[in-house]
Amino acid sequence: MARIIETSTGLDALTFDDVLLQPGHSEVMPGQTNIATRIAQDIELNVPILSAAMDTVTESRLAIAMAQAGGMGVIHRNLTPVQQAEEVRQVKKFESGMVVNPVTIGPDATLAEALSLDEGPRHFRASPVVEKSHRLVGILTNRDVRFASDPEQKIYELMTRENLVTVKDGVQQHEAKRLLHTHRIEKXLVVDADSRFVGLITVKDIEKSQLNPHASKDAQGRLRAAAAISVGDDGYERAERLIDAGVDLLVVDTAHGHSQRVLDAVTRVKKLSNSVRIMAGNVATYDGTRALIDAGADAVKVGIGPGSICTTRIVAGVGVPQLAAIMSAVQAAQDQNIPIIADGGIKFSGDLAKAIAAGASAAMIGSLLAGTDESPGEVYLYQGRSFKAYRGMGSVGAMARGSADRYFQAEVRDTLKLVPEGIEGXVPYKGPVSGVLHQLAGGLKAAMGYVGGADLKDFQERATFVRISGAGLRESHAHDVTITPRKARIIPAQAADR
């Protein structure tokens, strides 16, 4: 017979709306706080936010914007393995400290072969000329091929080989920038100590990195990217392709992470690579968290049914209110220092602050990011307002497209026989994702200022919750007033001082 058990928040399992953070003595201003976090062994983010692996939230465009802002995007798996791997490649090559493994050509190749790399002589840009031993012998530029007419002419007869501007592998960005400026070129060739070609440093990538100083990047200066996989052979094969594409974090993404199939998948995928980290979920209990950690997970994703478009708790009657789930997972993971990711239920920046205060290293967010410019889908008008589509991965539409195995219904071929655990809907259009992330991060920093935490660890140690009533929740929101929109205006410094 079922029994009522006690959770980390007592007999009453609590969620974000049940509590508030208590203010305390503070010597910290919000602008002085540090919200950097670690979401896996060697993956740090400057903003503790990941975008959800949902087909109306995260593809390469949003993942790029997330990484540039200091967060991370998890590319959904309602794509073929080839398509998903290509989405990861788009992120990894968008902003590189160094372009690794660029297209090269051998000195014995022909002009025709070189032009086939691009769209003919008018569009040909440049290609390093590299021997089979990887030794750099020249560069073939647009000037070299512009007036060449013999398609069988060898590259070594056309290429530029004198006065090549090269830099050593590991060169500092400021030194590379100085060389590019001195020689008035847009690409510098990177070689190792034995003059073997390693990669390219470009002006565009240097400019991008200066525009986004807090971007999440790997050791090679490329934007960070994560991708979701399933369990079984499909998940394993997908993981192999994603690793080849350069993914930083694989997310074993299921509705019930405390399942033997998921535990086996984590253990199996973990053996594929020593450099790629594994996040697994979703769970909502102490035991579920421990099981995933024992299976080899580098981070654990927490949340059964808290999302705005998730109906698992209604359809199956299963779940744990999110705050209690986070605290239970943190308790299970703290002795091994495994990060906990709070997935779902974030409606306001204050909810993000509460999730972090409860011990989460970061939060995964879907609905707040779904209506942005960078999310998949088109903006449409409804009753005079702009919206974008948003649906749960447990909705009929998403399950029919490929996510049925997330809910262990992969064998169901007739969509009428699917048992959905999510809905399809729309969210208001929000503009660029950078604005949404700014508000979320700003709310978190404000909470840290109220509590007195200079960084996330300090914030978590100082934070205390107070339970509130329904009346307290109503009092917390704007009330007894009609909210009117007003355009922002800049207040002169003298007026602000008064």
Swiss-Prot record:
Mycophenolic acid (MPA) is a non-competitive inhibitor that prevents formation of the closed enzyme conformation by binding to the same site as the amobile flap. In contrast, mizoribine monophosphate (MZP) is a competitive inhibitor that induces the closed conformation. MPA is a potent inhibitor of mammalian IMPDHs but a poor inhibitor of the bacterial enzymes. MZP is a more potent inhibitor of bacterial IMPDH. IMP binds at S308, D343, G344, G345, G366, S367, Y390, R391, G392, M393, G394, E421. Gene3D superfamilies: Aldolase class I. GO terms for molecular function: IMP dehydrogenase activity; metal ion binding; nucleotide binding. Signal peptide: none annotated. Its cofactor is K(+). One of its GO terms (biological process) is GMP biosynthetic process. The active site is at C310 (thioimidate intermediate), R406 (proton acceptor). Pfam families: CBS (PF00571), IMPDH (PF00478). Pathway: Purine metabolism; XMP biosynthesis via de novo pathway; XMP from IMP: step 1/1. K(+) binds at G305, G307, C310, E475, S476, H477. It is an enzyme of class 1 (oxidoreductase). Its EC number is 1.1.1.205. Keywords: CBS domain, GMP biosynthesis, Metal-binding, NAD, Oxidoreductase, Potassium, Purine biosynthesis, Repeat. It catalyses: IMP + NAD(+) + H2O = XMP + NADH + H(+). Homotetramer. This is Inosine-5'-monophosphate dehydrogenase. It comes from Rhizobium tropici. The gene is guaB.
